[in-house]
């Protein structure tokens, strides 16, 4: 989301997860690979942004606040009992200027996560 660019700039991807161990593994893999990630909260209070009178779920909040967290709250409605994480790469996946191109991120982070063999 563009909201993660506002929150973190272009130096780190945002991470939200329903499992702290998974979030920690992602953040550690980011540090190890140089493809940093920073955890943002995903509290029960954030779930209210998915309520709407027009549909079963809203996929966007009603204002400017917590946009990246609202995206994770929406995704959480489809995860049931799984451990999951949302890595918001809008800030890190592309160059802003002068070159408009992909950076390849979060490939280093995800590669480190998979190669670390800590996933269970």
Task: List each language-model region with its residue ranges.
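A generic structural signal for tightly packed, nonpolar segments enriched in small/aliphatic residues
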Residues: 1-120
